[in-house]
Design a protein with these regions (language model features):
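Amphipathic alpha-helical segments within well-ordered protein domains
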Residues: 10, 114-117
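A short, well-structured edge-of-sheet supersecondary motif
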Residues: 4-44, 83
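Short, charged, amphipathic alpha-helices and their helix-cap/turn boundaries
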Residues: 23-31, 76-112, 123-125
Length: 125
């Protein structure tokens, strides 16, 4: 089963613009096959925004920071970054618009929040 899963991943990786993938087959909660680096941390960008937002809100609830904690030099707060109104672009650090004036879909804003959460809690990924 593991060889078949590895072959399947290799086949799909050749057509995708990504260098790595990992997979697993589970049956009744038991892992029966794995392929790829199971310990690698993958940037899943948009897929993780919901889970990330939940994590940030738990941190707010537990007093790690509040929604109005300033995160960037330009004054973007947790609230701004969660709502894509922090002024930062999709992948850029440089501001694209003044904070709070426009919503710009931003993975980078979530990276900033994640970095701050890790530094405040001393918890890794």
């Amino acid at each position: 089963m593991t060889n078949a899963l590895s072959s399947l991943l290799d086949h799909h990786l050749s057509a995708w613009p990504v260098p790595n993938a990992a997979g697993a087959v589970l049956t009744s909660g038991t892992t029966v096959a794995t392929a790829g680096d199971q310990n690698r941390i993958f940037e899943l960008a948009s897929v993780t925004k919901l889970l990330s937002a939940y994590s940030f809100m738990v941190a707010v609830e537990e007093g790690v920071f509040d929604l109005d904690t300033v995160i960037t030099e330009q004054g973007a707060t947790v609230r701004h970054l969660l709502s894509h109104a922090g002024g930062v672009g999709f992948r850029e650090e440089d501001p694209r618009k003044p904070v709070g004036t426009r919503r710009i879909y931003s993975s980078y804003g979530f990276e900033l929040l994640g970095d701050r959460l890790v530094s405040e809690t001393q918890m890794g990924l």
